[in-house]
Amino acid sequence: MTQLKTWGLLLALAVSLTASARKVKVNVQQPGTLEQQLPPKVRKSLTELTLRGSLNGADWHFLRSLMGISHDTTAVDGKLQRLDLSDATLHKSTEAFLFNYQIKADSILPQWAFYRCKVGEVILPRALHLIDSNAFREARIRRVVLPEKVSINEDAFADCPDLEDICFPKTLGSLSSNAIVGCEKLQTVRMNSVLFISGGGSIRDCSNLRKIEINGTLGHIDGWQTFSQLPKLTEIVFNGPVLSTGGSKEWLSQCPALQQITFNGPVLSTAFAGIADLPHFHNYVSLPNQVFLSKSEWVKGIPEQGPYTEETFKAFRQLQQSFEAFPDFHSEDQTFVTSAILNNFLAASAILHDKAGLLKYGRLILESSPRKLYSLLCDSIFNDFAGQPDFDALKEKSRQFGDYIYILKTSPQYERSEQTQQAFTYAFDSPILKKVREELKLDSIAGNGDEISRIKRVMYWLHDAIPHDGSSSWPQCKYNALDLFRHAQENKRGYNCRFLAEMLTDCYLALGYPARFITCESKEIGDPDCHVIVMVWSKTLNKWVWMDPSFAAYVTDENGTLLHPGEVRERLIDGRPLVLNPDANWNHKSKRTKEEYIDRYMAKNLYTIQSHLTNRPEIENEENSYQDVITLVGKGVTYKGGGRTTSDDQYFWQAPKLP
């Protein structure tokens, strides 16, 4: 009798039933109790469920069974057709709901949450910030309602064969690569405002999709295969303000039926280009005098010299208001998108001769991305403002962050030390290096001839053999030239500058040339954009020389004499000539110029210079290898990385003891 009273109380407090027991509302006040609140008799005919309260992994495991799928993804008898979670929240817990998958955050719909579930309509919790990867993979859903400001990860909606309607919120955060894939019944995608649409097939392989429409403000849309494999797509329409687009001839891929792309609102900046292999494509359509910055020959921008109509200024104000109305997102993409948009507003303000706008956006960029502002203000479109005190003051303030040669000139000087410091060593007799020399056939690669020619040939060989890939993951192998070479060949991959430099250092050491890979960093603490190059000792020149396998680059003086990094730094400071080899390049796809590579990139990254004291293969496979590094800094400069520091440049560039 007591047990019956308990069940009655639970149903009275937590469950509201229709006469047929098909529609149920449950308030899960204690995570993990959902199953207790839905007795077997209620579950049997349940088709519509509205949940409030907090759900943990155990609740989600049970919920999946109501949607016809078990813990191991086999089919079970579940009839649920509508699930309303709008007032529910997720509760981080250790209980697995599918295999080993758990609810790991209160604001993230976890991976595989609805995997293969059979439910007609889902209304997601309002508190969600992210729909994680594969959350709806292979789910038999027809309609899903997304919460405000949510972002969608890759493959979140992958291979959902019945999906007909995605009800987007008033403002979407980010739509990642491959977010909506293989949804064959989807015919129209209508988004409202959206912060960021990624390239790489954010909407892909939806065989019946005919129209993509964005009705609110668009923050940024990438320009590489953003929409792909959409054989029936005929139209893309932007009905609201567009703040930024990428662009290339491959911004769309395999969309053969596409006829037109329409901008029905103002456009701050676009680089959309003509699209290859679209036999039915007519053109881009945009409003006259409402595209402010265009890098596209297909979309006409406003003339830099004017004249401008009131409609143009009205459109610009609309873009400003749209940007300011964007909410704060719980998304890493917001910083990137905001930075690009502020840069665009700065340039557009200059073109419109809007000094107040220019100063406003310049100050915002100075706060958020100070390094960028100086290079932006050096563009010729700002020439008309030069000599005006407030503009000059802004530019001068930005100089200390973005004029890298000026930063070197004003940096603290080095100072000689009388103290005895640990010597740099070179492991010429390492058995690993002997193997590297033999199996990579380095003597054949270096060839005959003078020393400098041999040094260059080895650098060029590595540059050609393995591409530079700055975004690649760290390799899962021993960090010696032979294992890294094999790993790259077997996995058809490239390496970032660090591993290319480590490989080249091993090759030089194997051939008997003293060498170190050195990490060059900027003044800005936490700047991830450092660069790693090699310095190798030349007996002929009796000094170190600069070799960079990432860009097949070396630096000389005006007479063609090779320089080492310290000499390059000195010449940047005192203004003496520097020459970059004319064949310096990135993966044979784009050339590098002296202005780009030396004056900007390396000038930024020669503020501090770091090297290992012990130079041998696999040094960075070792735990606590940072204890073996020493960083050259100006006197009084605080370096927050690992290892020791020195301000004695003579010590840092000391000649090696030759074998």
Question: Residue ranges of each PLM-predicted region?
Answer:
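Secondary-structure boundary elements
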Residues: 404-495
